[in-house]
Amino acid sequence: MMDTPEHASTSSRRQLLGMLAAGGTTAVAGCTTITGGGDTTSTGGGDSGSSSIVVGSKGYGEQVTLGYVAYELLANTTNATLVDETGFGGNAAISEAYRTGNVHAYYDYMGSLWSSHPPKHDSADFDTPDAQYDALKSEMESEHPIRILDRADWQNTWAVFVAERAVEGTGIQSISDLAAHVNSRNYDIRPAFGDGFRSRSDGLDALLDYYEFDPERVTAWASEREFLETASAQAAGTAVDEGYADLGVGYSTSAWLTDVDSVRVLDDDRNFWPFFHPVGVVHEDVATDAVVAALNTMPDAIPDAETMQALNSRAAASGNQQAAADHLQNNDFI
């Protein structure tokens, strides 16, 4: 699961809540590898000095794939000996790991680092991704033995999506438009959301409050359309696709969103959720020019959310490492 932000009480404040994620790894050879005992090691090529680098990630699908993007870039462009610790754990585990040198390199999200890694912030009041990035980089590099590398231009945050059939002729393009629709006593759109999402601090009820949905209208809406709580965000997408619901909430780069036909992603026009752009994180002990250059390839290799979404879909079919290696090779990054 992705790390998620928390709702704020005013339109100018955005609060974040970091969630732990854990999971396994997929190891498919995309370069010269030696496997054994659960770890994968590789001796890369290129012109950096030889050193040992532990490559990590958090545990869910996109994070593991990004971990293997880092692994393949380092394996193919440096002389480092690599240790595969993709799927290492959630925020608490991986933040402890890079502070102690047990993980040297991985990609994380700005919102996760800001909210869930020491010193941890309960709020983020940034108008642009660059403002959040600058504050994050300054603080994290002064607090920890790491460097924050270049950020990508895309982000993986929550997305509100609605079936085209349900909004045809309404002009609904944004969450504010949806609020106006419901506040005008239109209850025709049935929402679906994952287990527990409605009451989360960054979930549906908080979103409705932030966007000033009239509480009486929301009560009437829920009574008339019976909000559908599903087992997961992906199941909510399936409910929309199969006509059991009209509106869902999921992750913006999830592979399953590509399988849902005829949906419209609504603009979070008041920035309820903050900026979750990926950035490279590297321990200062291994931050040579070659290592930094390799890891800074990611924003070019994955230039937009659509590319990440497609990569997630391929990873689900062929495995995280194979998908990462194929993508980098096919686009001449390794």
From Swiss-Prot:
Signal sequence, renumbered to the chain: 1-29
Domain of life: Archaea
InterPro entries: ABC_Gly_betaine_transp_sub-bd (IPR007210)
GO biological process, one term: chemotaxis
GO molecular function, one term: transmembrane transporter activity
Membrane topology type: Peripheral membrane protein
Pfam families (alphabetical): OpuAC
A Gene Ontology term for the protein's cellular component: ATP-binding cassette (ABC) transporter complex
UniProt-annotated location(s): Cell membrane
Recorded family membership: Belongs to the OsmX family.
Function as written in the Swiss-Prot or TrEMBL entry: Mediates chemotaxis towards compatible osmolytes. May function as a receptor that binds the osmolytes and transduces a signal to CosT. Has probably no additional role in transport.
The protein's name: Chemotactic signal transduction system substrate-binding protein CosB
